[in-house]
């Protein structure tokens, strides 16, 4: 394996530890080394589409829900969720005390809050993002108008009630909506961190020796 692949494996291993710590796991150091055939070129979950990028994002970030070993949808970063009787409102109650953790377990000041999910979905429907996940979540209220620039992003049917309560409002029923929340595009994005890194998301310059 060449040096480039080895370096990528190390980056993925360190970032995987970021996910485990962010999900409120044990304080003990945990690492996972995954050797890949193709180098991930994009670690931005709102735009990742290539198989290697999606696999990396699915292992780097946590979402509201995940599938367990039996294939059932279970809470991940949330404690629980509620669905209205008409199927148009989804309310998620996030776990408290979740934080993003840097490589090698370095602590950060970035807490995972409902606003991170709001910002993530606003990015999905920002025309400049050109997110492939916009079509998957087109049932969200005002998503089409926000995407085509005729409505303010603040009118998108994704809102935070306090730090730990996230609400989705749909314009039409979508019985697959919950399962779509395991997609990378639905994973949280801290606005301050994103702006500070200009969306580079761990990508690095490589110079061969």
Report each predicted region and the residues it spans.
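Bacterial N-terminal signal peptides that target proteins for export
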Residues: 1-9
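C-terminal motif of bacterial Sec signal peptides marking the signal peptidase cleavage site
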Residues: 19-22
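Bacterial signal peptide processing site
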Residues: 24-26
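N-terminal lobe/hinge region of extracytoplasmic solute-binding protein
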Residues: 35-85, 205-209
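Sec-exported extracytoplasmic/periplasmic mature domains
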Residues: 65, 69, 96-99, 122-130, ...
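Aromatic- and charge-enriched surface segment that lines or borders ligand/interaction sites
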Residues: 79-136, 167
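Gly/Pro-rich hinge or "lid" segments in bacterial periplasmic/extracellular proteins
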Residues: 163-164, 169-209
